[in-house]
UniProtKB/Swiss-Prot annotation:
Region (Disordered) residue spans: 73-93
Record's compositionally biased regions (Basic and acidic residues): 83-93
Lineage: Bacteria, Pseudomonadati, Pseudomonadota, Alphaproteobacteria, Rhodobacterales
UniProt-recorded name of the protein: Uncharacterized 10.1 kDa protein in ndhA-ndhI intergenic region
Highest taxon above the source species: Bacteria
Species the sequence originates in: Rhodobacter capsulatus (Rhodopseudomonas capsulata)
Length: 93
């Protein structure tokens, strides 16, 4: 079940929508075109672990994986912090 209190991250790779969706049990679900690929236990969006999972699938090219590795390429949607007006940052490298 999706956790409405944490942000969802999304990026388009090879014309397909890839999302890191927060789930209630302190984790994130990796989805490709709305289908669950795998899950991670993580309080923050696990971008680099998601890139590893996408690479393991074998159906994304090197260029797509490079795009996914760049945290600035992911679109953040979800809850906004009350005091700053900004969303929480993605995973820190």
């Amino acid at each position: 079940m999706k956790d409405p209190n944490r942000p969802t991250l999304s990026v388009t790779l090879d014309g397909r929508e890839v999302k890191l969706v927060p789930v209630i049990i302190e984790g994130y679900r990796l989805e490709v075109e709305g289908k669950n690929v795998t899950s991670f236990l993580s309080k923050t969006p696990p971008i680099m672990r998601a890139v590893g999972a996408l690479e393991g699938r074998g159906d994304f090219g090197v260029g797509d994986l490079e795009v996914a590795s760049d945290t600035r390429k992911w679109t953040v949607s979800g809850p906004v912090k009350q005091d700053t007006g900004k969303t929480d940052p993605a995973e820190k490298n």
